Every structure is written in C-alpha cells, then in structure tokens.
Amino acid sequence: MKLLIENFKKYISEESLGDFSDEGMVNLYHYTNPRNADGKDSLVLDPQYFVTSRGAYSKREWETSRYPRTFFYTDYDNKEPIVDGALLSTSVPTNEIYDLKNDPEGYVEKHRHPTYGLRKQMEWETMMKDIHSSYRGIYYSIGKPNVVAWFNPIEVFPHEK
C-alpha cells in the first residue's frame, strides 16, 4: 500500500492548486477549434460534449474515466505541443476545485481498491462522481502539465495571449 501511494505521488507533479490562485480565484484556459470561437463574445463549454466528441488527449483521459468533464490548463503556455487553436479563458473560485494532487480529504485512499489501486473506469469513475458531489472541478495531472477538469457547463471567453 505504501508503495502504491508513493508511486501515485510520483505520478503527480509538485505544483499545487494554490500556486495558481489569486485572491481566491483561478484562471482556467481551454483551447478549441478557431471556428467555435469566431466572432463570439463567449461560449458555454458543456462536459457532456466530452462524452461524444474527444480529441486524442481526451481519448486517453476517457480510458481513465468516462465521467463527463471539460479540461482546462492553469497556465496557457504550459500545454502539450499537440494542443493548439483558439484560446478561451474563465476564472472560478479556487474553493470550487478539489486539489487531488494534495488530496487533503483522502479521496484516493477512500476509493482505491485494496489490491489494484485506482483502476481505469472503475475506482477513478466513482472517485470523480464523489468529488463532483462536493466540488465543481478537480485539479490533477495526467503527466505534464497540470489540468483542471470541470464537471459542470461553464462560460468561457476569448483570451488574447
């Protein structure tokens, strides 16, 4: 069990959600096809879209959990090289996002299987649902960079770099 937790901690990087908080708010950044944002003052991103339409990045996350969510970066310059497009942003209260990287409420321990840990589409799924019952988003890492997965529809705005 100790080895599992140590490996999980290696899986996540050192930055915490608080590093991105400014006066209790976190800026979130999302890239989309430029056609989706052309001439619009704002868009509403709906996590249900993730269920039916996924890019390569989202497909990997889909294998981990099929729980509906929209992905955001906490730093628009710190993204995978493959990610491009029109940049959108929004700000949300930090306290609406659960910091899974530090896991202060022990969700990982609560949901992990005693032998197999957090299995894709199993414990990950129930853990996301449980976190969503108290939070609107979750901060974690799927390698590098860190992301916020938002569980609810959210209004976003065009963002100039």
Identify the role of each PLM range.
Residues I5-E15:
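Proteolytic processing junctions in secreted/extracellular precursors
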Residues S16-S65, K79-K161:
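Active-site and NAD+-binding cores of ADP-ribose-processing enzymes
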Residues Y76:
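Soluble catalytic regions of membrane-associated enzymes that act on cell-envelope
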Residues Y67-F72:
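A short, exposed loop/beta-hairpin motif centered on an aromatic-Gly-Thr core
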